[in-house]
Amino acid sequence: TEIRANAVLWEQSISVLYRSSQIAAQSEPLETAKKRAEELGVSVLMTGNAPQRQWIRALIAPAICECAANCVRHADGTELYVFFLQKPDCTEVSLTNNGAVPKEKITEGGGLSMLRQRIEEAGGKMEVWSSPRFKLMLSLPEQEEAAHESDDR
C-alpha cells in the first residue's frame, strides 16, 4: 500500500541520515555521502573543484545527505547537483535538485536546522531558497582557525 511504501521511504531516509552523521570519521566524506544518496535512489552530480581540506569536506558531506533525503521525500527528485566554487577566503557550495519546485517557503526542520548549526559553529554561513527552485548555499571559511577565532576572546 501507499502508506507502507512511504513508511519504508522514511525508514531508509532516517537510516541514511543517521549514517551521514558518522561521515566525519570516514576517510573520504564526499564519496561516502554520494554512496548514501545513491542508496536513496539519488544520483549526485558534482561540478567544479571539490575542496581539498578534509574538515571542509566533512562539513559538506552531511549537506549532501540531507539534500538527497529531502529531494526524495519532498520533491520526488532523482538527481542532486552540487556546485563547488573556490574563492580566496572561502569555499562556496550550491546544492539543487531535479525535483518538483517547493510550493511554499521552506521551513527548516530537524535535518536542515542541525546542518545550519554545524555550519555556523564552523564559522560558515547557510542559506536556503525555495524560489525559483530549491537551493541550499553554503559558504565555508578557507582557514579552520578563522572559524574558531571568536572562541579565543
Could you tell me what each predicted segment is?
Residues 104-132:
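ATP phosphate-binding glycine-rich loop and adjacent ATP-lid/helix-beta elements
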Residues 79-89:
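Short beta-strand/loop element within the Bergerat-fold HATPase_c
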Residues 143-153:
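C-terminal end segment of the histidine kinase catalytic
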Residues 40-65, 106:
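Conserved short strand/loop->alpha-helix "switch" segment adjacent to the catalytic nucleotide/phosphoryl-transfer site
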Residues 1-43, 85:
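DHp/HisKA dimerization-phosphotransfer hairpin of two-component histidine kinases
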